[in-house]
Amino acid sequence: MKLKKFLLTFNAFQFFFSLLLWVPIFYEYQKRVGLNDTEIFRIQSIYYLVFCLLEIPTGYLADWIGHRVCLILGSVSLIVANIWIPFNPSYSGFLIHFILIALSRSFVSGASSAYLYETLHQRNELDEYKEAEGKARAYSLLGKVICWALV
């Protein structure tokens, strides 16, 4: 794959992976299906705890099985989480949903930068890394700002 196509694909991944279009309305959805504030914020607390606890193991796993594989695993777990919740709108359903999202985000968090770095290193294009990483993060942020405003 040519460098330009690779960077376009990488930026698209960063843009779409971080969208999470449901975030601005999810609190209201949880309230409407019967969760109270204590339950909602307990789930959020567990999400952040699980995310932090999974950071090191998933980083190690990414180094062991490959960063690209972890990007795929992160994407699959995010898809499963978002398919899961409409069929399980309960406290335990939301808890599983957010644990899967924590797993997904921990798979991708360091693996995406490492994958970009490794790919550019293999192509002898490391001088492009800072700009490519910056653009990818900008596209991720741009997606959130524009799309969340529309939701």
Where are these regions (language model features)?
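Membrane-helix interface residues
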Residues: 35, 64-66, 127
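Helix-loop boundary and gating motifs at the non-cytosolic
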Residues: 1-53, 84-86, 98-100
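Cytoplasmic helix-loop-helix junction between adjacent transmembrane helices
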Residues: 99-140
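Hydrophobic transmembrane alpha-helices of Major Facilitator Superfamily
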Residues: 19-21, 87, 91, 103-111
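C-terminal ends and interior cores of transmembrane alpha-helices
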Residues: 76-90, 94-95
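Residue-level signature of mid-helix packing/kink "hotspots" within the transmembrane helices
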Residues: 48-56, 141-149
